[in-house]
Amino acid sequence: MISDQDADRPRWAPDGKRFAFVSNKEKGSQIWVADFDGASGTVTAKHRLTNIATEASGELWSPDGKNILFKSDVYPECDATPAKESACNAKKVDEARNSKVKAQIFTHLLYRHWNAYKEGKQTHLFVIPVEGCTTNHVGRGALTRAGELYSPDAAQSAAGRVGAPAPTRDEKGSGPCSVARDLTPGDYDAPVFSLGGQDNYAFSPDRQEICYASNHDREPAISTNNDLFTVPVRVGAGDSPAQVLAATKDITSENKAADNTPLYSPDGKYIAYRAQQRPGYESDRWRLMLYDRKTAKTYDTLRGDLDRWVGSFTWAPDSKAIYLSTEDKGESPIRYFFVGGDLFGEKHDASDAQQTGSQQEKHKFIEQEWARLYSVEVEGGYNDDLTIVGNGTRLLFTRMSISAPNEIQVLSIRRPTIEPKRPFDVGATPIVLTRLNDSVLSQVSMSPLESFWFPGANGDKVQGFLVRPPNFDPNKKYPVKFLIHGGPQGAWGDDWSYRWNPELFAAPTSSGPGYVVIMINFHGSTGYGQKFIDAINGDWGGAAFEDLMKGLDYAEQHYPFIDKDRESALGASYGGYMANWIIGHTNRFKCIVSHDGMFNTESAWGDTEELWFNEWEFKGTPYANREQYRKWSPHLSATNFKTPTLVVHGQLDYRLDVSQGFDLFTTLQRQGVPSKMLYFPDEGHWVLKPQNSQVWYKTVNDWVDQWVGK
């Protein structure tokens, strides 16, 4: 539908006649709106909605389709009335762009995040009307609906037509040419940073209010205390920062751990959101909570009975049920539960003469079963991005597996009544709506993911996975690529990624017919309960290392086609840390690949941005708990290093600074260990650029082939 410019994050308007998207075609990242003809399936017109100097992203339609909420990284000292704030930000952007001095001054931590310096900016939420004039820069020109840019004095358009009718506007941002209004002023990220998934902000159904997540603690670098805040969309004439802040309400202040991803119920009574309970611990269990907007009470919907992390979730249109995804043993099933009954203290009198027998049974059932999870029978794979459509009769979701990227599927849901035995009548087989990758996948041979279990550390059952090479011959012996996941609170599973893709690692290379890929979900992995996750806290090289070695032992003993004399180990992030730990604690591998791994735990604490992570995992700071840091630091085993190692690191990795990679490579070279370093000056914690990804795969596979493949 959009082929003449880049387009990202498409979002349909409530009426289905338009959609918004983000594009870098003009003025950097901006919000665009396209008119859509449903009959022909084509875009009939499109225009740029925003013209904000600090750029725009993350658009979200209001329920009535009249406004769009979006994010922009702005200078908090510019907080003022909408017009003045916009002009102030534009001036600062111009000054920074044109200045020959690039020095920065930091007065607090978290001055950089993931792969970028914050440059004194904070993320704020803005709202802008969709209809009429599409400006949001007073004094910088205004866009007509056709996208022409008026000069600051409105005397002529960019097309040069002197006397063209200028859009009206005023200092306060009222009228048909209203500038975008900042709904989250202050020196905070509001909303907080998100790596994807559900937004950390939402509109109320009546469009009068928004809810968003923000951390207002004095030092966010050591805090996970994201709270949920609500604020009216309009707070008064002028919408000054003082007015907005006075009308803003913190609804989760009692919880000192993280709250995020708010989502209003369609009837407007509740806000559902995810929450953790332990402050400072980013890998605590994500629970699904409900905030009652009338009583201001908060409820744990499943009362702690689900020992899994709640992923994405969505409301049924009648607000009676919530659908959610949960990671479980390498898969992500879809589940649902009822909202009502004794969860909110509601009691239904079954003897009420006005109730029919079916109504009495329905009420009784909800009282008893509100917390029971029911499964939507979608076998295997990872299911996510849940949406209910068709007046509650269809469930849309994305599904992927290790051998196929995401596609959109739909499942029929017929719910005429609520019955104890089968409250929802769920269609048995989803219908695949998109097949965007079929033509490519038909040309590629891939193997299914095989699961195995073995006794790991502490006698606990641990799950592993295996992928055979294409055109597998059981009579042959195959070398091994032993992949170690990051996190450490992450997991391997039946999902797809172009980064660290097990199918690509299993594929034939110039040196042979392919590799057996083995992956272990060691203690600390997600999808096996919170106790299993917590086991790695303060024990980075302990049970996890034991699980990995025992898992590989098990595979060697039970899969005779594995050549145990030709094994390699590869890991990134925590997997890179474990690769570094392995170099100093075993010589069983012919070669190692360490990508963005922690090498010196003490210096890594000072280099990282999210200090809460290191201080939780190593139980404090290096100067307060030096013994713990040194116990698990790979660099202290450097005299044992012998295994040929490829080091990979990106200059823009601020989670694990590039100095960790340089330190490792220097140590390997000084120890006389065969080693090589692949350095990306333009990548962060992940290698994301397609051409860089090709270089990454070739370099990694060539390294393994050199030491293992032949």
Residue ranges and their predicted role:
Residues 16-20, 68, 210, 268-271, ...:
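Hydrophobic beta-strand positions that form the internal "hydrophobic ladder"
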Residues 136-165, 174, 235-239, 341-353, ...:
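Intrinsic, low-complexity polybasic segments
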Residues 14-15, 63-64, 205-206, 266-267, ...:
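Residue-level detector of Asp-centered blade-edge/turn motifs that repeat once per structural unit
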Residues 424-430, 434-565, 572, 604-606, ...:
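Cap/lid segment of the alpha/beta-hydrolase catalytic domain
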Residues 35-40, 130-133, 233-235, 293-296, ...:
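Short loop/turn segments that connect beta-strands within beta-propeller blades
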